[in-house]
A protein has these predicted regions:
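Acidic, Ala/Val/Gly-enriched low-complexity intrinsically disordered segments
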Residues: 7-10
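Extended, small-residue-rich solenoid/repeat segments and analogous flexible loops
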Residues: 14-57, 63, 183-189
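Glycine-rich hexapeptide-repeat left-handed beta-helix
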Residues: 22-30, 67, 73-75, 81-87, ...
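Well-ordered, non-transmembrane segments within structured domains
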Residues: 52-75, 80
Length: 189
């Protein structure tokens, strides 16, 4: 990483690290960290107390902004293009192992359990909890404090249960996304 120093109108000197041209910004003395074999796109943004596990992929124009609380991502987490992961001053944002966050989705101060899928342009609001292997449909809005049980599909505004997931449905999504990072972006030439 290359540190870049610049002066802002704020009273503190800002330090921004450039990693593979992604913006990795220290906030309140905390710098984002990531495990082995992670792909971070050239224009992704990670700030503050953000920790990624191994084999994660943060795609183009995705933002993981942890300026007032923590963001924790397990292993094999996939945050796709233009998605935003943020937290509140009282609630971290937690994405457990094998979570996939679709293009343009927002996860704000919520917990997403292992193997869950957040569809494209869906919104998951503060203190919501998405159960293991659950699927939130594209464009759905999971409202403040909603608890989505494991292995259910929810859709709509506000999101409601549509049906139970088919056996192995969420696992199939997780395999697909972990495959293309290895097949396309981390393969050796």
């Amino acid at each position: 990483m290359i540190p870049i120093f610049f002066v802002t109108f704020a009273p503190k000197l800002q330090i921004i690290y450039i990693f593979n041209m992604a913006i990795i910004k220290t906030v309140e003395g905390k710098t984002p960290q990531w495990g082995k074999n992670c792909f971070i796109a050239e224009n992704a943004v990670l700030t503050g107390d953000c920790i990624l596990g191994d084999d994660c992929s943060i795609w183009y124009s995705a933002v993981l902004r942890s300026d007032v609380d923590a963001i924790r991502c397990g292993n094999r987490v996939n945050v796709q293009d233009c998605a935003c992961i943020h937290q509140t001053g009282t609630m971290p944002c937690i994405l457990e192992d094998d979570v996939s966050v679709g293009h343009g989705a927002i996860v704000h101060g919520a917990t997403v359990r292992e193997g869950a899928l957040i569809g494209m342009n869906a919104t998951v609001l503060d203190k919501a909890e998405i159960g293991e292997g659950a699927i939130i449909a594209a464009g759905a809005v999971v409202t403040h404090g909603t608890k989505v049980p494991a292995h259910e599909i929810w859709a709509g505004i506000p999101a409601k249960k549509v049906k139970a997931c088919a056996p192995g449905q969420a696992e199939e999504f997780a395999k697909h996304y972990s495959g293309y990072i290895k097949d396309w972006y981390l393969k050796e030439d």
